[in-house]
Regions:
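N-terminal active-site segment of His-dependent metallophosphoesterases
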Residues: 1-69
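Short, mixed charged/polar active-site loops
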Residues: 3, 124, 239-240
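Generic preference for hydrophobic/aromatic residues in regular secondary structure cores
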Residues: 38, 80, 105-106, 242-244, ...
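Intrinsic-disorder/low-complexity regions
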Residues: 43, 153, 234-235
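His/Asp/Glu-rich metal-coordinating catalytic cores
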Residues: 49, 58-221, 227
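C-terminal functional module detector
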Residues: 215-248
């Protein structure tokens, strides 16, 4: 059985401009602590795979010490593979080229759908994704996609909007998502945690944000812990379980 974590919209290093400088600094440290708690959970539970579906950072130019903190934390979880799909906040090269990425971190670049295949334990896993290069991505990254190789476990890690064709934030349709044939679509951009849903043979959800940053971000926060088992090349043989995990 493959176990992995799905998180998104962490927004490290926000300005918190409505707060005093001292209060803003304290809230930024609290966000870091929540992220660090998630990393410690990954280490303690020996989770081998984590999908970060965009907006790990709040801007395309976070502070250098914030970059060092985040990359060092992920590197310390050396037995976990991290896949990141940059979103409309942490787009472009200034974030992802500032330091050499840890060996266990993969970042999807460019607005085109691409993939990486890796072995996680006994499982051959293909992770698909794209990355924002500017603050908008009006093209549908799933347009024209022919579908996955069902002999492997296929996961989509994506910052996007669903069934909003005029959205400037990587609009994809439910019809395309179902036709693509992913086993699980780990979505980001919507800050309210979504209930786990299913389209055809594809499970999907928005992870929501790791921690609320203002009074309009209430409700369930955290990440999804996913366990799935796939036998053979038939998607209907998929065993799937999802659990909500809080880190605050």
């Amino acid at each position: 059985m493959l176990t992995f974590l799905h998180t998104a919209d962490i927004h490290l290093d926000p300005p918190f401009s409505s707060l005093s400088p001292q209060q803003a600094s304290k809230r930024r440290e609290q966000l870091r602590a929540t992220f660090q708690s998630m990393i410690q959970y990954i280490r303690d539970e020996q989770i081998p795979l984590a999908l970060i579906s965009g907006d790990l950072f709040d801007s395309p130019t976070p502070q250098m010490d914030t970059l060092r903190f985040a990359f060092s934390a992920m590197e310390a979880a050396q037995n976990c593979r991290f896949f990141i799909s940059p979103g409309n906040h942490d787009y472009g090269s200034k974030v992802w080229d500032a330091f050499p990425l840890p060996q266990n971190v993969t970042v999807f670049r460019g607005g085109q759908l691409s993939f990486r295949t890796c072995r996680i334990g006994e499982h051959e896993v293909t992770v698909w994704g794209w990355g924002f290069e500017t603050e908008s991505l009006s093209k549908d990254p799933l347009s024209g996609f022919g579908g996955v190789d069902t002999r492997r476990i296929n996961l989509l890690c994506a910052h996007c909007t669903l069934d909003k064709p005029d959205s400037p934030y990587a609009p994809i349709s439910k019809k395309e998502l179902q036709a693509a044939g992913f086993d699980y679509a780990a979505l980001g951009h919507v800050h309210n945690a979504d209930h786990m849903k299913k389209l055809g043979n594809t499970y999907y959800a928005y992870a929501g944000c790791l921690e609320g940053r203002s009074f309009d971000e209430i409700g369930k926060k955290g990440a999804y812990l996913i366990r799935l088992e796939k036998e053979g090349d038939q998607n209907n043989s998929l065993s799937f379980h999802a659990k909500r995990i809080r880190f605050t």
